[in-house]
Amino acid sequence: MYGTWFTTGKVTDLLARTGLDRVPVWVPVVLGVVLMAFVGSVRIDPALQGWVSVGTVTLLLVLNRRRGRGITVFLMMLSLLVSLRYIVWRLTATVQFSNWLQTALAVLLLLAEAYALMTLCLSYFQMAWPLRRREHPLPEDMAQWPSVDVFVPSYNEELSLVRSTVLGALDLDWPADRLNVYILDDGRRKAFHDFAVEAGAGYIIRAENNHAKAGNLNHALAVTDSPFAVIFDCDHVPTRGFLRRTIGWMMADPNLALLQTPHHFYAPDPFQRNLAGGMHVPPEGNMFYGLVQDGNDFWDATFFCGSCAIIRREAVMGIGGFATETVTEDAHTALKMQRRGWGTAYLREPLAAGLATERLILHIGQRVRWARGMIQIMRLDNPMLGAGLRWEQRLCYLSAMSHFLFAIPRLTFLVSPLAFLFLGQNIIAASPLAISVYALPHIFHSVITLSRIEGRWRYSFWSEIYETSLALFLVRITIVTLLQPHKGKFNVTDKGGLLARGYFDWDAVYPNVILAGVLCAALLRGVFGIVWQFHDRLALQSFILNTLWVVISLIIVLASIAVGRETRQTRNAPRVSVRLPVVVTDAHGRQMEGHTHDISLGGLAVGTRLATPDMVGGEVTVRYDSARDGIHVGVPARVLDARDGTLRLRWAVRDLEDERQVVSMVFGRNDAWAGWADFAPDRPLRSLAMVFRSIGGLLRRRPAEAPRALHEMGEGELPATEEKLEKQSFVLKPVPRSARHGATASAALFVAFTALVPAAMAQEAPSPDQSGVTAETPFGDSNTGVVPDALPAIDPAVADRISDAEVTRTLTFRNLGATTGPLTLRGYSPLQGLDVVVPANRVVTHAQLTLSGALSPSLLPEASAVTVTLNEQYVGTLKVDPQHPQFGPVSFDIDPLYFTGDNKLNFHFAGEYRRDCNDLFNEILWARISDMSRITLTTVRITPERKLSRLPAPFFDPNQRSTLRVPVVLPATGDRGALRAAGLVASWFGRIADFRKLSFPVSTTIPASGNAVEVGVNLPVDAEGGRPAGPMLAEVANPNDRWGTVLVVTGRTAQEVEVAARALVFSPDTLGGVASKVVSDVSLETRHPYDAPAFVPTDRPVRFGELVGAADLQGGGFAPAGMTLPFHLPPDLYTWRGRPFLMNMWVRAPGGPVVDLETSRVDVSLNNNYLQSYTLSPPGLWRKWSERLVNQHAGAVGHVTALPPWLLFGQNQLQFNFDARPIDRGACRRTPGDIHMSVDSDSTLDFRRGYHFAEMPNLSYFAEAAFPFSRMADLSETTVVLPDHPDTGTTGAFLDLMGFFGASTWYPAAGVTVMGADEVAHTPPKGDIVVLGTAAQLGGAASGLLARSPYVIHDRHITVGQRMGLQGIWYLFQDHDHAGLKDGVTANLNAPIAEAGVLLAAQSPYDSQRSVVAFTGDTPERIHDLVLSLRNKGDLPSLQGDLVLKNGDRFTSYRTAPVYTVGSLPLWLRLDWFLGHHPSALYLAGLAGAGLAALGVWAWLRGWSRKRIARDDLTGEL
């Protein structure tokens, strides 16, 4: 949309019609920037951010297909918005300062990212609107054309290199009397002087070589007088039209001090020449000269680049000449002129061409000089300071200077994953999902937008290779120059060198080779960590993420190393591919017309059908004429090869005139370099493929090359020393062009000079193709480990017979709690144990322990063993057999008298591997007890003791870990009072059971065996059938089973039954040691929201000691068993932008010389998610003494730990694991093992920064903590709707649900309201509502209660209802947090509920702040199964969204309903929440901001562009 408007003028027309075109352009810019900043700072959930990212990326891909500067500006704004969101997220959500090392590494990475973002912004600024200046016409009257001095400075270059440049300059298409070409020879070589005389060029030397090139130029300015000076490096040969196409701007704008043209290189740079895919990639310098300089021209900030430029003498002399303070005199000179108010310009037409650096090491040396110079400018003459520059110019210079600071950030990005893989420091504290949805869009937008901007000038991912090739060399230069800016000298870059054979330049790549080795080691470490080390999910993801990061770094480094594989360079005259019409005349006068394939200063290849082999060795004349360029060539050449219609010729240059003609043909054509940008537009995937191809070239074996002797390559023998001129100031004036031929002919001493022209300048015939070797990049496997075979299922042979006879059960150690694998005992951790539970109503008559495992074969048999005890009573010993380290099965009989209710089965390891001294931490000290070891118990029931004081026994055994069943007898299941009383009793049992599984099977008669609870009106209270005399509790024998007990809760009325139930659950300690008792009512205090005993208070800090006993926070040994702190929270706690809650933890370790506190640590985890590790080292001496005076925690080590809200649920557990190390006490010194470590019970949890606010419906809140019903501990704001006549299955589900509520709140459900379905129509339920029953039982009440649910249950199917009007639109455009859940609309939900349970959540139709949760299904049994799932931790993750379907063991979750909220927030936080939870609104606001900013910027840039060129539209597309 934006692109179409920007390119077609629709926006301009619309603004003109509405009058908005008169609004200043800064208004939409400011509005857009403010809106972008606001949107960029909003924090949203990673899943929602993912949708926003998908939207922005999709828009990017769509708009990127359209052309136009307007679209480009909009995409830049969009990229900046995405990057802003990323950097705000990095700064506010991913930074944790856990220790000094992590802090340093995290800050370093943040600084590198800030640098990268600044560079991105500056790049967009520079390249937002390339000016695309065209040539300005010269005056028609040539008499007005100015005189021009052409300077060719030289120091130590070869004469063969300088000759072409001088001859090309002498051949410039400019009036001869106004063209003065000078060789500025700081080498004072006589050969150069003689060449200048022969060619008719001027020659200038000076007495002292002060200030290198800048001093040379300043000296030349002092001895010449033309108003304009043109500078060419000695290898830059101009086209004939150079002056005609450039001087026009200098004449048209008298304030123009400089006009720069591109530095084009006709020879490939090291990256093109050495990389396998390099020749298909634009040269490294193309982006600067093709795009950056053009963008600088827009801002009047063109840089002088030292060559191929025109300088106004007045301007440069006005600043005291060329700058000499830095080694980059060119850029500094331009800066000084711009400070004085002079303008600069850039013409993006390559009008000269030179040689690129042939070898990587030379390229690095050149870039090191550039980096030093730019940093010197930043330190000595910072463009951001001082007067004379506009802010736009300052930013352009800031971009140039800061670019050469890339070394440290680039290295930081490459090695950052090593912090985690080698040092264990997580420097980006975020989940992989969050990193993906924030970082990847930032990178993607940057890459694609830059790809669009840079197009054919620079391919994606190649900047990384260029920078990495230099980074390690520049690190030292960067730091040294920043600290000592005056250091450093000007170094001349060698060019025109030859290589006899290819080789690997270790000097140029050895730092990257070392870095690659380190990255390979990190890669192996990452793979090892992923495959062979045990991690929780986040740790595993961190390993994967950092390993992928290493792979990316390694790809970049390998590509940069591949540049060091230098290829053979046997031609000192590189070929230029060009098709020119030529005429070849042989010795017999036969003329052959053809076209060149390539040409060079050494020769050419001509395609002609008349080429015959007999021409080889003969001499021909090559003619080329171009009237347009004023070039006429007729030069002899020798035929080297003639076949396949191609003549390969070597120039046979006879004199200087022939050489001039060759130079003119090769370099002088005005369109010689017009194809400098003829590269395919960038496509990132293709560019990436080229990177891999280049890496493959590094790994591919190169065919053997026979080295060529120098004379074979045409390199003549050079004299050992060159003849020098005297050190003095000397000026030889150039000879006018008209007088040159006579002067040259009369100079007999130069007749032999042409013999010095190297024979190797001829074009060599190409060697036969020897590339018949194919190479295939090896892609090995991922080093994933072999998955071990699954252990065979072992039948535990459980014989669970319910009778008076003996019952035998076999339990594996896995059944006893060894769920993580074998019990491992070590020297520093010699004790491991398990709990063996015997039911309270049974005694053990026989027990046998069967063990298997292994003992270290390195142990001494006579001094090593594992001792087995039960309740500190000896059971047996496992002895060491070095020949057979594995043992078992070994059986031990256990005396039944050793058993109690809860029994401790312990294994104590004592091991020695040498007779004198043993290191407890030596890895050979180990023993393992298999988790498939087992214990077999034979038990019998004992006669029950029926006393109310023993309640909840025998119905509940606290030592039991298996599922508990409490049968409930309800003679009248439809009695509301009895249901409330039974629900109250069930919730009491649920509170007692807590985390244990518990169910209440309901019947109308007493079961045939076992225990039961009977609730009802006027029930028998003794064996004789006596009736209650009031509210009464009684324990009586099961009439069907003398071993069973029935607890009777009864009364004469329904009200008395409820009184009896309240007395049972609220005052069981007052019942006494009697079998029956008439009880009185209990008065209850009014409950308040969130005061459930299970919930940690959120209005004050909570001591650990309030949650667990001090003994639970203590452990013995150097590596004691993990300590846990369970706690419950209301799941609706909300913090601003997910700020973490705080835990103030104090740990205590033994004093004295026992534990090495510096290396010992305690690991803290939350819900099995690792949080942090802390040293046990005490505080400093001053702090230690001050704490003794004022701190209750004196002697303890304190730490503050952040508890992320996303790791907190309804039920939580903090884990503390100590890992201590003993102090080295020397040889044969016993290390005390009976040490104790603890977490101080006065440590606190603080949740005060949380607000009670939640998005609903959310069944996970209900499954975790019965929310929102648990908001009131007694369920006084909860109504349960049951069928009017519930059957036993539905009633059992109701009681199970009450038990679940009691376990969630730790408070009986004394205030719950129970009503029938038929009552709903005339008495609307209050508060939050639970609906329980099948669709058939509930009738029409279900549809009314679920009126705001999107689901409809009809004809034994559940579907998404048909919503009309605005409600339907809301369903279509609502924002979802799916979290992987299905949407009922998009999934076209139409599921049968036969044999299925249905759990539904919806907003209450009676109160928008209330909720409805419905349990329904096809049969009561399915409902009952669904309620039982709430007690199964394995099923809790499946209970999410607003709809759960349970078919057998399979759960399917949906989220379809619109979100509503419960709770309250301050106004400011509510606004933040709204934007953070509506990604579509955030997305549209972001697009609006980017669009406004882009519109204003586009209009501003367009106007500035026209102003920049002084109203002369010569710039092409605007």
Curated annotation (Swiss-Prot):
GO terms assigned for molecular function: cellulose synthase (UDP-forming) activity; cyclic-di-GMP binding
UniProt region (Catalytic subdomain A), positions on chain: 144-237
Cellular-component GO terms for this entry: plasma membrane
Pfam families found in the cross-reference section: BcsB, Cellulose_synt, Glycos_transf_2, PilZ
Homology family: In the N-terminal section; belongs to the glycosyltransferase 2 family.
Residue intervals passing through the bilayer: 24-44, 71-91, 105-125, 404-424, 427-447, 465-485, 514-534, 543-563, 1481-1501
Reactions performed catalytically: [(1->4)-beta-D-glucosyl](n) + UDP-alpha-D-glucose = [(1->4)-beta-D-glucosyl](n+1) + UDP + H(+)
Renumbered residue ranges of the record's region Cyclic di-GMP binding domain: 732-1518
InterPro entries listed in its UniProt record: Cell_synth_A, Cell_synth_B, Cell_synthase_bac, Cellulose_synth, Glyco_trans_2-like, Glycosyltr_2/OpgH_subfam, Nucleotide-diphossugar_trans, PilZ_domain
Superkingdom field: Bacteria
Enzyme class, UniProt record, top EC level: transferase
Stretch list, region Catalytic subdomain B: 314-374
Known pathway: Glycan metabolism; bacterial cellulose biosynthesis
Broad class of the protein's primary localization: membrane
Membrane topology recorded in Swiss-Prot or TrEMBL: Multi-pass membrane protein
Mitochondrion found in the keyword field: no
Active site: 186, 330
Subcellular location(s) per record: Cell inner membrane
Span list, region Disordered: 765-785
Lineage: Bacteria, Pseudomonadati, Pseudomonadota, Alphaproteobacteria, Acetobacterales
Keywords of this entry: Cell inner membrane, Cell membrane, Cellulose biosynthesis, Glycosyltransferase, Membrane, Transferase, Transmembrane, Transmembrane helix
Protein's UniProt name: Putative cellulose synthase 2
PANTHER family: CELLULOSE SYNTHASE CATALYTIC SUBUNIT A [UDP-FORMING]
